[in-house]
Amino acid sequence: MIEMISISAAFLLSLLCETCGLVLPKSSDLAIAASNYTIIKPDLSARLDPVKAPKARRKRYISQNDMIEIVEYHNQVRGKVFPPAANMEYMVWDDNLAKLAEAWAATCIWDHGPSYLLKFLGQNLSVRTGRYKSILQLVKPWYDEVKDYAFPYPQECNPRCPLRCYGPMCTHYTQMVWATTNRIGCAIHTCHNINVWGAVWRRAVYLVCNYSPKGNWIGEAPYTIGVPCSACPPSYGGSCSDNQCFPGITSNYLHWFK
């Protein structure tokens, strides 16, 4: 039997599939400029030393095809939000975020972490047993939460699990479409054993995606409603692509992902 669960800081428990998301408890850190979070600082990356990680982790943490699928899917979702977004920024791959995701995935701990990085990052998690044909099988459940989301911010989309697992969850989705979150880095790891709320799953595929700057600020909308690209930050120079503020980079994937 194939099982799959998605997680963020709250949980929604069902028999075969789990989708939930990270909700940050306060927005006091917003006083720090969002640009500080765009690229993870080298000293933070150094605190997760690859040499100290399990030997299996030294393999490539995610394939280039998976990178492309994840980024393209996020941008597809972000460009088609409704109501339309005036300030949606185009999302690109960040290798530093991916390396941090790799280190956490290698721990095979079914929870968000490491805790000292979560004030800098947003994070979505997904786990499943059995084979899969596409990495999007682990990502699409996050988007599926859109059916339970009502703009501008979640109402009853934050059940408390595993003790009180009921009601819809939608904060995976809101992290995916948070307008100012413009970088993503993910890693996938096969865990020989992973404890998922008391049940030991064997040979489970564990996906960790880190986002920067982080989103999901309580009481705030994920984006500003308006004509697409009508409220882009000045740094984008008026460039717009697929209803998103587009950065001044080449569209060569090899350049983005090297």
From Swiss-Prot:
Signal sequence segment: 1-21
SS bond partners: none
Cleaved propeptide residues: 22-60
Compartments reported by the entry: Secreted
Positions of the SCP domain: 71-211
Coiled coil: none
Pfam families, A to Z: CAP
CDD domains: CAP_PI15
Superkingdom classification of source: Eukaryota
The entry's keywords: Developmental protein, Glycoprotein, Protease inhibitor, Secreted, Signal
GO cellular component terms attached to this protein's record: extracellular space
MF GO annotations: peptidase inhibitor activity
Keyword match Secreted: yes
Positions annotated as glycosylated: 36, 124
Similarity annotation: Belongs to the CRISP family.
Function: Serine protease inhibitor which displays weak inhibitory activity against trypsin. May be involved in facial patterning during embryonic development.
Protein name according to UniProt: Peptidase inhibitor 15
Species of origin: Xenopus laevis
